[in-house]
């Protein structure tokens, strides 16, 4: 499998290391976030893996779609335009997979959280909130992973209807609001926690990333899956689509 990497930052370099160690695939091209990109840049590639920033992705995604090469996207912070991107992917009969986090471990965390949120829904004594920690270089907050975790809760627990990213002084949190607290600290790779609390006890679910290897390995594995899916069923996919196949195999 010939892979073009869009983005030569920490995640891009980690993916290149994982690919080199596997011996099964090759990175045939690396495009920098500041490069001018058109569809021809992806000629000869089997799959594209994009880990850039919001502004670069928004500038580049038309070329990604037009290339006809399946695209794995790990860039976060563009949820507001996702419906538009999805529509363009489907219209062009292209193939794209998006996830805020490709780590298998964190996706098991999502599924565990989904079930926990569903289980506490009938019991009003249990409240729930989220927190996330990342290094000081991470620009977006809450993280894409935290937003995905919040969506899991909102979709599984009807008592929570909206996300609150910041609390103003003197403002009381409403019972139907889900607080998502963000911390930027040092060189933390990523810590995501769900806290479920009642008068009697507290339950904590936490995923801690020790390094970027899990993210990179998951992205490469997702790329393998997407290449096969592109051949038979082009479209816009999420990590859940990939994991449903993976866990049912």
Swiss-Prot record:
GO biological process, alphabetically ordered: diaminopimelate biosynthetic process; lysine biosynthetic process via diaminopimelate
Gene3D superfamilies: Dihydrodipicolinate Reductase, domain 2 (3.30.360.10), NAD(P)-binding Rossmann-like Domain (3.40.50.720)
Active site: 134, 138
SUPFAM superfamilies in the record: Glyceraldehyde-3-phosphate dehydrogenase-like, C-terminal domain (SSF55347), NAD(P)-binding Rossmann-fold domains (SSF51735)
Swiss-Prot/TrEMBL catalytic activity: (S)-2,3,4,5-tetrahydrodipicolinate + NAD(+) + H2O = (2S,4S)-4-hydroxy-2,3,4,5-tetrahydrodipicolinate + NADH + H(+); (S)-2,3,4,5-tetrahydrodipicolinate + NADP(+) + H2O = (2S,4S)-4-hydroxy-2,3,4,5-tetrahydrodipicolinate + NADPH + H(+)
Top EC class of this enzyme: oxidoreductase
Keywords recorded for this protein, A-Z: Amino-acid biosynthesis, Cytoplasm, Diaminopimelate biosynthesis, Lysine biosynthesis, NAD, NADP, Oxidoreductase
Coiled-coil residue spans: none
EC number per UniProt: 1.17.1.8
InterPro entries from the UniProt entry: DapB_C (IPR022663), DapB_N (IPR000846), DHDPR_bac (IPR023940), NAD(P)-bd_dom_sf (IPR036291)
A GO molecular function held by the record: NADP binding
GO CC annotation: cytosol
Subcellular location: Cytoplasm
Family, per entry: Belongs to the DapB family.
Record's protein name: 4-hydroxy-tetrahydrodipicolinate reductase
Originating organism: Chlorobaculum tepidum (strain ATCC 49652 / DSM 12025 / NBRC 103806 / TLS)
Lineage of source species: Bacteria, Pseudomonadati, Chlorobiota, Chlorobiia, Chlorobiales
Gene name per UniProt: dapB
């Amino acid at each position: 499998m010939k892979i073009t990497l869009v983005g030569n930052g920490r995640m891009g370099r980690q993916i290149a290391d994982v690919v080199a160690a596997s011996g099964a695939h090759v990175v045939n091209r690396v495009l920098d976030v500041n490069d001018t990109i058109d569809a021809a840049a992806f000629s000869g590639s089997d799959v594209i893996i994009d880990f850039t920033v919001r502004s670069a992705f928004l500038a580049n995604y038309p070329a990604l779609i037009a290339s006809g090469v399946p695209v794995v996207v790990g860039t976060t912070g563009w949820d507001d335009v996702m419906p538009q991107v999805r529509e363009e992917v489907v219209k062009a009969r292209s193939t794209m997979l998006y996830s805020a986090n490709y780590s298998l471990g964190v996706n098991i965390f999502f599924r565990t959280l989904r079930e926990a949120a569903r289980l506490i829904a009938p019991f009003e004594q249990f409240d729930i909130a989220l927190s996330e920690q990342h290094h000081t270089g991470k620009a977006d907050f809450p993280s894409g992973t935290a937003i995905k975790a919040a969506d899991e809760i909102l979709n599984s627990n009807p008592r929570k209807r909206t996300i609150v990213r910041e609390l103003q002084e003197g403002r009381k949190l409403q019972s139907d609001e889900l607080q998502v607290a963000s911390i930027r600290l040092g060189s933390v790779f990523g810590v995501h926690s769900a806290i479920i609390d009642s008068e009697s006890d507290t339950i904590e679910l936490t995923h801690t990333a020790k390094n970027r290897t899990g993210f990179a390995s998951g992205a490469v594995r997702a790329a393998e899956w997407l290449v096969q899916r592109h051949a038979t069923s082009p479209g816009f996919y999420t990590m859940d689509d990939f994991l449903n196949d993976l866990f049912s195999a």
